[in-house]
C-alpha cells in the first residue's frame, strides 16, 4: 500500500488536521465508501493498485451524495470515477469533470497511517 499522500491538495493547504475516517480493510480494492464530515460527505476510493483518493461525495449533476458508489476506471490515461447517476467522469487526482471542465469536485488529501485512512481537513 502506498502510504504517501496520493494527491497534491496538501501542497496548497495552509494547515491540515488529519482525521481518521475508516480502516483500510473497510475499503475493498477497486471500490469507494462514503464518509461523513462536519460540512458534508467525502467519497473515499481505493484503486486496484492500492492507491487512495478522496473527493467530495456530492454529485453536482444529480445533486445527490452518490460519488462514492461510482465505478472506478481510466480514460485517456487518467484515473476516474464515473458518477452512478448520469455517468459523468471525474478525475481522481484533480476532481475535474471530463465531460464539463467547468465543473469539479473538491479533492481531499488522503493518507494511510498504519491501517487508519486519514483525510486532511482544514478546520
Stretch-by-stretch model annotation:
Residues 1-20, 24, 123:
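A boundary/linker detector
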Residues 25-28, 83:
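N-proximal short alpha-helices
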Residues 19, 28-33:
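Short, hydrophobic/aromatic-rich segments at coil-to-beta transitions
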Residues 32-123:
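Rieske [2Fe-2S] iron-sulfur-binding domain
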Amino acid at each position: 500500500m502506498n502510504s504517501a499522500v496520493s494527491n497534491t491538495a496538501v501542497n496548497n493547504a495552509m494547515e491540515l488536521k488529519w482525521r481518521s475516517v475508516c480502516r483500510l480493510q473497510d475499503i475493498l480494492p477497486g471500490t469507494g465508501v462514503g464518509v461523513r464530515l462536519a460540512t458534508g460527505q467525502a467519497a473515499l476510493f481505493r484503486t486496484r493498485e492500492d492507491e487512495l483518493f478522496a473527493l467530495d461525495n456530492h454529485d453536482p449533476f444529480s445533486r445527490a451524495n452518490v460519488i462514492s458508489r461510482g465505478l472506478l476506471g481510466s480514460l485517456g490515461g487518467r484515473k476516474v470515477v464515473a458518477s452512478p447517476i448520469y455517468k459523468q467522469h471525474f478525475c481522481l487526482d484533480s476532481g475535474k469533470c471530463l465531460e464539463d471542465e467547468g465543473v469539479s469536485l473538491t479533492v481531499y488529501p488522503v493518507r494511510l497511517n498504519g491501517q487508519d485512512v486519514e483525510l486532511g481537513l482544514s478546520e
